[in-house]
Amino acid sequence: FFLWVRHNVPNKVDLQWLKMGGGIVKKGVHPPAKKFNAGQKIIFWAVMIGGLSVSMSGIALMFPFQTTMFADTFAMLNTVGFNLPTNLTPLQEQQYNQIWHGFVSLVLIIMIMAHIYIGSVGMEGALDAMNSGHVDRNWAKEHHSLWVEEEDQKAAKPAE
């Protein structure tokens, strides 16, 4: 986790990448990206946050009627202007847990399936990169131009 966070912090370049649809909308036009593009960052954070959320709701489902996760969450949300019920019965807590667990899981499954498709057969060169662990320099320039520039600058610095 800690090795990847610094590369997955959103920045202004990601907004441009999203506006251009990641290069999927127009053939041959790839927006600039660093080591990870906005789509990869979205997947990273969805898996980190969604995975934690599904794990927590799963634990609550494994040990029914032991937690008040939603009543507590609703109370926090009410402090910023929401008007959600906080006096939930244990049965209501379980119902919210089931709905949340199923919904977040479904969203993650859909996102991961799309990620697998795009990262394998949906993008030319992606499968080769996954198999070898390396990307062609021209592919990297086309899809992650800012990252290539950063790496070139690192390589150009003289050793001290």
Region locations from a protein language model:
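Membrane-embedded alpha-helical bundles that constitute the cytochrome b-like, heme-associated redox core
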Residues: 1-160
